[in-house]
Amino acid sequence: SLTELGIGSAIIFALYMPIADNDEEKIASLMRIYKYAYWLIGSVIAVVGVAMIPFLRFVIGDAPQIKENFYIIYGIYLFNTASSYFFTYYSALISAYQRNYVVIGTSYVITTLQSIVQIVLLLCCKSYMPYLIVQTVGTQAYNVIIALKARRDYPYLKRRDAKPLPKEEIRGLFRNV
């Protein structure tokens, strides 16, 4: 995503050496920064998205072909997009450990189930709203499952005492973005 601005790649790159050295404290410190960065991005997306609501009717104009309330559809999309940023650092850590098969496998199962349910709902209901809700539930289910797997496999992520990184190292991270 454009809003990610390469932060994920820079931090995953920064994780490789501490992972190779099994330096859990450094990994926890990097993940703290990663979590903060993504929470900030997700929050900015949510705030800007909510601030845009009064202007949607000017951007969209009249949309007579849409039966459902456009503002509700927009709100669901906004929630789905912004909330995903609050979990993405977990999948990045799993990928940095070169266990991307966990991320891909989980995504495959959730996407397959989601698609089946969405097709059935479209055939039965002929409405976009249930389709969109299932998409959001699928995204949230994926995020929660990946977060639970990461927290189970890497319990040091729960540490509250991870030392902050030195400012020079943080600057180096942002130079790599």
Predicted regions and their residues:
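Residue-level recognition of transmembrane alpha-helices
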Residues: 38, 42, 74-77, 107-111, ...
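Interhelical loop/hinge segments that connect adjacent transmembrane helices in multipass membrane
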Residues: 146-177
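Small-residue-rich midsections of specific transmembrane alpha-helices
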Residues: 1-19, 38-39, 45, 81-87, ...
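Alpha-helical transmembrane segments of multi-pass membrane transport and lipid-handling proteins
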Residues: 35-62, 116-123
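Membrane-interface junctions at transmembrane-helix termini in multi-pass inner-membrane proteins
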Residues: 81-107, 129, 152
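Transmembrane-helix boundary and interhelical linker motifs in polytopic inner-membrane proteins
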Residues: 2-37, 90, 95-102, 162
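Alpha-helical transmembrane segments of multi-pass membrane proteins
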Residues: 51-54, 63-87, 104-108, 171, ...
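Membrane-interface helix-loop junctions in multi-pass transport and translocation proteins
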Residues: 101, 112-144, 152
